[in-house]
Amino acid sequence: ENLSFNPLNEPCGFTTEQYARVFGETLIAIREADPVRFVMLDGNHVASEPVPLFFNFKSTGQAFRGYTPHAVSHYRADYIHDQPKGEPSWPCGPGPEDDPNCWIWEQPETTLKKYAWVIGTGYPVMIGEFGCRNKLRHETCLKWMEHCLKLWRDNGLSWAIWNMDGPCGFLDSDRADVDYEDFHGHKLDRKMLNLLQKYMQP
């Protein structure tokens, strides 16, 4: 009875009208089967823009992403072709302000500002995904993660990490610069786990 779900991950290329039609029809069908089931909707444009139309729908919320800036969270990801010239650091990045490859001016706060007014309405909002790929230096990754986690905690936001095990997680992440701890046959990144636990909300 506590199970919720997200009907569509990171809708992209939708006009507001298309988003409203697709999710509106989906919610109607869900409500016919279960009038009170909570449904989390990703914001439009890869979960970066809130859609106010659904604020009046009972038992719904909206999720956005916690990957800003992508040059940090997705550093050297094999599916990202536009990479920064140098390896990112945190909180400073390579390049001057007018350098298009410089990501320092894109902060996690930038994404949060788009949803700040929604949070103020009391409508449920959360960070549906966040994490940092395993090619970034571990120290930099943890600094960036703590920046994000503190920001969200201070704004009363819940969050979900992209994966617990794998390239963004704290188990079997295959990072070259982590002193892993054996945990029931898995390689545990204790520093990352401790950081996440530090900011977990009851």
Annotated model-derived regions:
Residues 137-202:
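Aromatic-rich peripheral "rim/lid" segments of glycoside hydrolase catalytic domains that contact
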Residues 107-115, 145-149:
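Short, acidic/polar
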Residues 15, 19, 100-107, 137, ...:
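Residue-level preference for long, well-ordered alpha-helices that form the structural scaffold
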Residues 39, 108, 195-197:
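Generic hydrophobic, helix-prone segments enriched in Leu/Val/Ile
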Residues 1-102, 112-133, 154-155:
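Active-site region of glycoside hydrolase catalytic domains
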